[in-house]
Amino acid sequence: MNVNVGIDIGSTTVKIVVVRDGEIIHKHYERHFSKVREKAVELVRAARGLIGEDTPLRCSITGSAGLGVAKAADIDFVQEVFATRKAVGVHVPQADVVIELGGEDAKIVFLTGQLEERMNGSCAGGTGAFIDQMAVLLDVTPSELDELAQGAERIYTIASRCGVFAKSDIQPLLNEGARKEDVAASIFQAVVNQTIAGLAQGREVKGDVLFLGGPLFFFKGLQKRFQETLKLDDAHAHFPALAPYAIAAGAAEYAGGTQKTYTVDSLLAALEKAADAPVVANYLPPLFEDEQQYEEFKNRHAMHDVMTQNVTMYEGDAYLGIDCGSTTTKLVLIGEDDQILFHHYQSNKGNPADVIREQLTKLYELCGDRVHIVSSAVTGYGEALIQNAFGVDFGLVETVAHFRAARHFCPDVDFIIDIGGQDIKCFKIRNKCIDNISLNEACSSGCGSFIETFARSMGYSIEEFCKLGLFAKHPIDLGSRCTVFMNSSVKQAQKDGAGIDAISAGLSVSVVKNALYKVIRAHSPDDLGQHIVVQGGTFLNDAILRSFEQEIGRDVTRPAISGLMGAYGAALHAKDNRRDTTTLIGTDILAGFEHNVRSTRCGLCENHCNLTINDFGGGRRFISGNRCERPLGGTKKADLPNLYKWKLEKLKSYGEASGIANPIAKIGLPFGLNNFELLPFWTAFLRKLGFETVLSDVSTRDMYMQGQHSIPSDTVCYPAKLMHGHIENLLEKGVDAIFYPCMTYNLDEERATNHYNCPVVAYYPELLKANVSALADFDFMMPYFELADKKRFTKHAVKYFCGKYPQIKKKQVIAAVEEAYLAQDEYYIDVRIEGQRAIRYADEHDLDVAVIAGRPYHVDPEINHGIDQLIASFGLVIVSEDAVWQLTDAPEVHVLNQWTYHSRMYGAAKYVTQKENAQLIQLVSFGCGIDAITTDEMRAICENGGKIYTQLKIDEISNLGAAKIRIRSMLAAVEEGRKLAEQQNA
């Protein structure tokens, strides 16, 4: 009798499979809540009676958290991809591809053709842990999330790169009232996208596909999304009952070939030895040495408090502040002396409007006839929704609300850091107004919600979890990395047997390091300031506050109402700006308050925005998801000059039919990357040679999905990923060939030491040729051309085109070259003339100019997500960097300036510092390595010239919530600065 035991110790669960003579006689699956070794012992002990005390057995361990246990117990370890292949070979031999999703691991194994195995690295995006986190965010269990997904009507775009980014997309959807069913299905679609883009990396998933792992077994909604995306029918998509245990079954199969034999008791003894093994890890100094040190710390911070008075004991006028944040809703009512009469702080649970209705009803009851709420203000992510729903008097951007509250506690404040549930906001104060704003871009690294979801996943409340870390003797050093990578650090610490207290303290330190070094990019405490106010609910956690003070080496001010500062600032703003009457709805309307949500897609322009329509009864309605004013009806802002819009229309015009009689061939031009600049050149050149040119359509999300299967790396920027869809689009149009040359150099504008294209722009045609299978037998023209040297280009063009098409003569190529350079020059002149017209309009109408500095392809609406329209909606005239860079001398920069696009941006930044009504907004594509250089230089040029630097990161994430905060904060700071200047000059 042969008994083999396979133990799969994953990142969130432990699985055991017992095989007797080739038949599975026992299988079990349990979450370990980080008690990895103890749970393994428990599962073996539970199978003891079934196996028999003296029965000889073989055992092997697998799984992402299994190696440490296997080493400590001296039990054979099998790598999990190998275990997967073992299981498949025995149980589903016809499989072509295996997709396995675990707690924090994802794998694809290609079994036919060229054998290939791929695993996620240290990123846990698109795995079971991610689904768990999203369920917590929606305040449902994972199984309820699955039920919701099956009632979906539409799919929202949610970033599939990693869990934290997806969270940044989901939260604004919830705040804007999106249906939970649709969000749930969109979460599953994000997992599918992450698996295909992140792991398949250009290799097609086809044939018989076997889906393994807990998430793919338990979640029917996820199964449906995989089947639909991969276009698999039921005959080719396999979801076996063994799915959650397959890797453990593979480990049992592998164990059959090992040498060591055990009895159940000797196996238990080995595992128990592992459970008691000492931990080897990097430690940090403790947060507090003893209770006395902690008491002194608490007493010091207790000094920064605010007066309170019970609302039932107060009589007179009162002012309401609401902070509808990304994960929590806060309400504060203050009296005439700024004392707090009432406050409330709770999780949104995905529906902030319900929370506020409930609390307003309660508040009106407490106020009776004695207290009159005469003014109100709302701030935060849900500001617009709540202002419309409840008739709140004022809406203000959250940075301004937090600054107003901070000034109340520390009049000399010169630096504020606010760590909320999902965002980190830092702002420097100069001359009593906000001078510089740092927001975490598209990443919630080191924010409060990460610690909260982590605490919950380990079975603790956030308060209990954080208290555990206060007196940890040896906090674990988890680094200062993206939170999903930190998950892996925590996993490693768990493998090593670190206690919950050490992990809790280590996480607190990591959150602080992320805020300081990733968001603020501080080099020393002096970069922050002398009078630092910390706020946001996360700083109510003493462990994080202590870590922050230890890291910067100085004491800070934490108001006792740290978590209520946005709402308190809003209440102070309502008091400062009180009007004669309030528009806040009263008890009668509140009693009949209702909130109905429906979704639709706007068809008024090419953005095709997903609109969420919130009806509140009584004729009150709020529409979100729009990037322009059109779907809102009513009075529309005058169409202000917008060079982004003008350039897009101008470039699209090059796609119009040329009417060439008897063309040599129909050549496709992909409408992306550097073709957003060189389209005039190539169109004129090819048409002069006698070709019909066909332009691919303007990018859309659907086009991206069409080409997604051939993207070989998920780390490349979104503009490059879109090129795969453009190639597919041109192939569908039936072109004879596609022309897309490789170009190491750009045109030389003589403002830099060199004139390179970035490597992605320069050589992406090579990558497309290698990865888009349809190009294998297609005429994909990708010669290496350089346009900076006209003579050299002419020589190469003659050789290439006369060699490929004998009917084309040398003199035709020479004539085409002349026409192409002329067309390109005319385009540049048109851009500059249009730019000057826009600037004149702004000057004549006393408007601000937003110089959007980016790359030519940032004009693509699928890449910028309508950011130009969003900025224009605030009453700014839009100009691009290529219209203004030449209006000033080249600025001094502290880096090797060798990129054409970069030198334009530096020139645009200098121009902004010389024009009073111009503001700079830099667009950066996420994943753009060389823009890491430009951002610091652009900031330095702006700040040295007395201007505010604003950066917006753009990628797959289409929700503009964070961008809106940044733009409004910048405009508020500019306005405040002007008011201050007027006062000083008066």
Q: Could you say what each language-model-derived stretch is?
A:
Residues 4-46, 116-117, 121, 322-362, ...:
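Short glycine-rich, Thr/Ser-proximal phosphate-binding strand/loop in the N-terminal lobe
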Residues 36, 113-154, 162, 244, ...:
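Glycine-rich phosphate-binding loop plus the immediately following alpha-helix
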Residues 166-197, 488-517:
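Adenine-nucleotide phosphate-binding core of ATP-dependent small-molecule kinases
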